Amino acid sequence: MSSDSKKRKPKVIRTDGGPQEGKRGKADGEQDARYYSEECEVDLRDPIKDYELYKETCQELQRLMAEIQELKSRGVKDNASEIDERRVQSCVHFMTLKKLNRLAHIRLKKGRDQTHEAKQKVDAYHLQLQNLLYEVMHLQKEITKCLEFKSKHEEIELVSLEEFYSEAPTEISRPDITLTEPHQQTLARLDWELEQRKRLAERYKECQTIKEKILKEIEVKKEYLSSLQPRLNSIMQASLPVQEYLFMPFDQAHKQYETARHLPPPLYVLFVQASAYGQACDKKLVVAIEGSVEEAKALYKPPEDSQDDESDSDMEEEQTTKRRRPTLGVQLDDKRKEMLKRHPLSVTVDLKCKDENVLHLTFYYLMNLNIMTVLHLTFYYLMNLNIMTVKTKVTTAAELTTAISAGDLLSPDSLLSCLYPGDHGKKTPNPANQFQFDKVGILTLSDYVTELGHPYVWVQKLGGLHFPKDQPQHTVTADNSLSASHMEMTMKLLRTRLQSRLALHKQFASLEHGVVPVSSECQHLFPTKIVSRLVKWTAIPFEDYTELPYTKDVVEAGLAEDTHLYYMALIERGTAKLQAAVVLNPGYSALPPIFSLCLNWKGERTGSNDDNIRAMESEVNVCYKELWGPKPGYQLLTNQLQRLCMVLDVYLETEPHDTTVEGPKEFPQEKMCLRLVRGPMRLKPFKFNYPQGFFSHR
């Protein structure tokens, strides 16, 4: 074996020499010939039989290799011939395996070629399909365009078929043809439409001729009426004493309307709509115009060019050289004043109530901000902001009783706050004003509302101004319809707000003296004898209210805001003291007050640790509709306080007696109750039943 390998080794590694290359070329040619012959042979041979031959050859090789291994393992020299014989047989089998391998590769190549050809055909068919689909889509689009095509005659509104056949002459309608052919029917209807339009054109010319004649007559009458003006003026002057005597100030109203011509558009819209509403629906509504007409006229006059003499110009130059330049702060102050400048004219509205109490409203217009404000109700116009503002002032027929806790009820800052939900009047409703504020260093308009008035949203709507939030606009035109749609509801809300605040003002005066006023109409809501009494009623700031531990739930629920009014009531009976923190919504009495309770008796008891305290809060906060009393419900607050005194009596009298303490019970039971407690929470009977006079559970 070693000698044979040494002889074969040079043939394997030798790579140079001409004869070898020649031999290699000849072998390659023979191999190509065999390749082509075997390629043809593949079609004639059965792959399954080749597979069986492959298996048999492999088995035979395994057998021969095993025999060679066995013969070599014996180590007998006579076995060399047998080993050579089996080696030759093995080589023959290897040649067979090589041939089968070549045939398998040829079959694989043919399979791939056939697959590639089939794939090319499929791709060609797919491309043809895509082309056909594109042509179909193109044809469908063209068909859709044809179907959607609209002729000019389709835009013409033709008369109905019934009118066409009843009114059109037979020469045009031709019913014997058009009833069966839609195309001829459409043509006939178009002919009839043309005929009608020709007639209308002739009629139009006739009307134009008549119109010109009437216009000439109107001009003649206008000239005649203009000649009457001097005579009418003299008659009006002569009738002034009669007007004053009969309380019919026609001349004064005429002058006011002349003054209204100089109002800015928002104030003019407000004046017209408020006057119309007063004449039609509210005779106690008085509308007037205040301010300087001359200053208003000067706003719309173009500035006159002044030509100074040479001496004057020299003097000015000398003064300017000596004068110091204004600082940046002074310039900003001047710009702010100019920015917040009000229109010289304002509109005042006086709302009179049945008890002769008067709410004065003054409306201003901030021209630069384009919003409205209120004080006296006096309405102003800020010219540069293009907004309106208002100031308030309340005049009462009789002097009100002084009440410390009622100080904020009629103040201008809180009287009209949240007349509509969320309308605090502290921010400008015009989004464009923020850009103007940034230029002059104004952080917010709330710093100037005391001087300018409050720019409530409802004030802008009364002036016909609407500012869209999504598209800020520097200039907004006044809309009469917007003002008219909000006038009636706003005036009713203003009168209701004034009456409710005046009622609260009177009630607070009694509450500060420890007296809970209950009208005769509401006496049936309470028992005859109530021992608990109100000993203290004070106003508290918003910050103190939020710091109370038993008001946490109300604050977290968003029911307490800085625009609301806050009060503290103290109710006592013996050693028991009940503290009630009250949130008064600006919309009282449409929105009820909210009570938060804390009882100091044998410890501190609140709604979080005592179910009966929570039930007492429910009696005044949830069941408030029983306490409204006669409309419009201005006695709700006092009735709630009276009910608190009542339920405190029930709470204390139904509390079980402590046997460890000697002596009589501190709070003997005086109220008649069907059951003292009920349910696992041991709730007490807080509901008063009239006219039986006993207490029961809800």
UniProtKB/Swiss-Prot annotation:
Basic and acidic residues bias: where? 21-32
Q: Where is the composition biased (Basic residues)?
A: 1-12
GO molecular function (one): mRNA binding
| GO CC terms of this entry | cytoplasm; THO complex part of transcription export complex
Question: Keywords, A to Z?
Answer: Coiled coil, Cytoplasm, Differentiation, mRNA processing, mRNA splicing, mRNA transport, Nucleus, RNA-binding, Transport
Q: Where in the cell is it found?
A: Nucleus; Cytoplasm
Q: Where is this region: Disordered?
A: 1-32, 298-327
Q: What does this protein do?
A: Component of the THO subcomplex of the TREX complex which is thought to couple mRNA transcription, processing and nuclear export, and which specifically associates with spliced mRNA and not with unspliced pre-mRNA. Plays a key structural role in the oligomerization of the THO-DDX39B complex.
Under PANTHER family, the record lists: FMS INTERACTING PROTEIN (PTHR13375), THO COMPLEX SUBUNIT 5 HOMOLOG (PTHR13375:SF3)
What protein name does the entry list?
THO complex subunit 5 homolog
